[in-house]
Amino acid sequence: MNKGWLELESDPGLFTLLVEDFGVKGVQVEEIYDLQSKCQGPVYGFIFLFKWIEERRSRRKVSTLVDDTSVIDDDIVNNMFFAHQLIPNSCATHALLSVLLNCSNVDLGPTLSRMKDFTKGFSPESKGYAIGNAPELAKAHNSHARPEPRHLPEKQNGLSAVRTMEAFHFVSYVPITGRLFELDGLKVYPIDHGPWGEDEEWTDKARRVIMERIGLATAGIKYEARLHVLKVNRQTVLEALQQLIRVTQPELIQTHKSQESQLPEESKPASSKSPLALETSRAPVASESTHTDGVEEVAGSCPQAPTHSPPSKPKLVVKPPGSNINGVPPNPTPIVQRLPAFLDNHNYAKSPMQEEEDLAAGVGRSRVPVRPPQQYSDDEDDYEDEEEDDAQSTSSAIRYKRKGPGKPGPLSSSGDGQLSVLQPNTINVLAEKLKESQKDLSIPLSIKTSSGAGSPAVAVPTHSQPSPTPSNESTDTASEIGSAFNSPLRSPIRSANPTRPSSPVTSHISKVLFGEDDSLLRVDCIRYNRAVRDLGPVISTGLLHLAEDGVLSPLALTESGKGSSPSIRPSQGSQGSGSPEEKEVVEAVDSREKPGLVRPSESLNGEKYSPKELLALLKCVEAEIANYEACLKEEVEKRKKFKIDDQRRTHNYDEFICTFISMLAQEGMLANLVEQNISVRRRQGVSIGRLHKQRKPDRRKRSRPYKAKRQ
């Protein structure tokens, strides 16, 4: 019974004619090009063609794999038409029969009606034998198949169409008794995908299942809306950092403002003993980075001048204490100041208070963008350095260890146990970041910092940044970072890549606040960080709200599953006001849970978080933004490929072929090519097949005398 079934091509016209040959009336097969669009008109089932990944021999065997979605109840399985495929090359007919014989309102015709009545209550194996023993089905099937060649050349440059089609398989998706079933003749049981929603049709459920199977499920996510929500949340986290510093240390703002008004920055030596010792870092760095054109002058906290950084670790540029500035001899032991009592035993508040003073004293200063921006890399070694810093932060005289000589840290120490903060621009980074993000939330945000009176500022955009390596320039974008929540691809190898940037905002702020990226600010800090654990699951699906008291909480979703961009009212005056307006969600995107995270309870209560926790959350938001940017870019490229393939498929090549053949004939080359092609076919084609047929009986005749002699 398994002889003579041929391969069928995946063509809707072929399937429609085959259905008519079965005797079915009022049914046609159409090809689907867009799984995101709803299907128009009544749909009886889906036929899905996919590549069969197992060996060719195993296609004749029914897979015995069973999972939790397999229906093993004999009553349910026998009451539907589900047949095991026991015949090779019959999967197309099996797929059509699985759809047609499970429909109650289709005119099946005499052949299929008789088949349905005869196999009622049969097991899947018995139904498979019934299909194989139906000559009407085999005849209709083979009438639309391409005839197999009687011979195959010994050498072929490529696979034939028949051999290529043998690697593909047809399965059906059919609604049966309110549930979606996947009927695959090569599986021992049907697969139950469950019921569909009350407000949707069964085709919506089937399209989702098929999209998940072929890896296009993410196409349903509105990446633009997710990116918008993430960038608004990034702005909110930056506001929370700014507000936390403003609330915790308000007295330092007026202190430093008065200091800046009394003494200009350029006249202060490197060994200045001011209470905050901010000018210690500004003078050397500003003097070293000054250019004649007055455009590129770098503050102490700005990550500029990549030639001072190793390729894989763009550090903050701080001039070593052994250099002369404006003729003033350097002081080998600068005075350091102690942190406030409530922050003295923590490592997460090294300089944000001093940065607030810069903000208060530097509002309204001119900001000149820099031409060569800096590239940031995701380097794990930064975390190791920070772990070394944490191990030494318990002593009163805090020393910050570095891996190599000539790499001064953001802090310097002396014998009197005072702490000198050398990074003065954290709040300016936050404030300018917020200001830029309010202008356009749909483009990558930029950092702008100002170092103080009399010195220009530097703008570090987050896009189009060169590699830290001076010799080459990277074309990678920030979208290549893995997601903080749903990307398992993060590894030390990827992180050590100098062309793979991390968030410029998070990298810079964390280095300003903590010296370097803290060990708890890794992307894999979900299990250890409270802010990431609480807000991580909803960071891309809902907006965050920052209260006046510093409480950060997610807003309740009013309308979920719309897939449209949320409408918000952005906060105003984020630079000068510590109480931004509330953000309200009109429409929220689909809130799908991310793997590896536990969704918090429905009643989400806001909490206050430390600067370290907020920076960890900020880094995760940046990584999630980069992940969605990569996905969006991938979808755009995929659409381009779809259009190219469609144009290639629908293009009429006949005119080109006729023109080419005419040109060959005009040049007198056509006759020679035809003759050569005929001679090749004679050597490798029909003659070889005939010789094989004649050699087989000859070999048997020759082998018998040899066997007789041996006996």
From Swiss-Prot:
Please give one Gene Ontology molecular function term for this protein. Answer: chromatin binding
Where would I look for the motif HBM-like motif in this sequence?
345-348
Region entry Interaction with nucleosomal DNA forming a DNA clamp with ASXL1: which residue ranges? 681-683
Q: Which residues carry this modification: Phosphothreonine?
A: 475
User: Looking at its record, which EC class is this enzyme?
Assistant: hydrolase
Keyword Nucleotide-binding listed:
no
Which PROSITE patterns does the protein's record reference? UCH_DOMAIN (PS52048), ULD (PS52049)
The record, for InterPro entries, names: Papain-like_cys_pep_sf (IPR038765), Peptidase_C12_UCH (IPR001578), Peptidase_C12_UCH_sf (IPR036959), UCH_C (IPR041507)
Q: According to the UniProt entry, which residues carry Phosphoserine?
A: 274, 351, 377, 503, 519, 567, 579
> Which residues lie in Low complexity bias regions?
269-278, 563-579
Q: Which SUPFAM superfamilies match?
A: Cysteine proteinases
Q: What does this protein do?
A: Deubiquitinating enzyme that plays a key role in chromatin by mediating deubiquitination of histone H2A and HCFC1. Catalytic component of the polycomb repressive deubiquitinase (PR-DUB) complex, a complex that specifically mediates deubiquitination of histone H2A monoubiquitinated at 'Lys-120' (H2AK119ub1). Does not deubiquitinate monoubiquitinated histone H2B. The PR-DUB complex is an epigenetic regulator of gene expression and acts as a transcriptional coactivator, affecting genes involved in development, cell communication, signaling, cell proliferation and cell viability.
* Record protein name field: Ubiquitin carboxyl-terminal hydrolase BAP1
Q: Which lineage?
A: Eukaryota, Metazoa, Chordata, Craniata, Vertebrata
